[in-house]
Amino acid sequence: MNKNKLPVRFTGQHFTIDKVLIEDAIKQSRINQNDTVLDIGAGKGFLTVQLLQKAKFVIAIENDFELITHLKHKFKQTQNIQVFGCDFRNYKIPNFSFKVVSNIPFGITSEILKILMFENMESFQGGSIFLQLEPAKKL
C-alpha cells in the first residue's frame, strides 16, 4: 500500500491520526480486556492498534480493497483481531455483546447509527464514534 494514500473524500473516508483524540475516544468508551470492539472503517489501522492493547478482540471492518490488504498484512501476526473486507451495511452483526470505537465513514453516518442503535439494541453496548459536525448537529 502507498503509505501516503489519501482518503477518498467522496465516499466519506478520512483517517484519524491524532493520538490524543484516539486515546480519549478509547478512554470514554471504557474498553476493558473482556470487550469485543468493532472498528468500522478501520482505514490504515491507527485506531485499531490502540484498541488491540485494551480489548479482548477487535473486529476491523473496511471497504477499501487497498486498505483491507494493508490491514491484513499489518495484523497478520496479531491473534486478537479479525479483518473483514466489506461495506458495514452488508456486515452481519455478531449475536454477542460488543462496543464500537470508530472513525466511521461520514457518508453513511445515519445508516451506521440506525443499524447499531435500532437493529442491534441487544448486542450494541455503546462506545465512541467520531462524527462529522453536520451529521452530529442533526442528531
Residue ranges and their predicted role:
Residues 1-139:
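Catalytic cores of RNA-modifying enzymes
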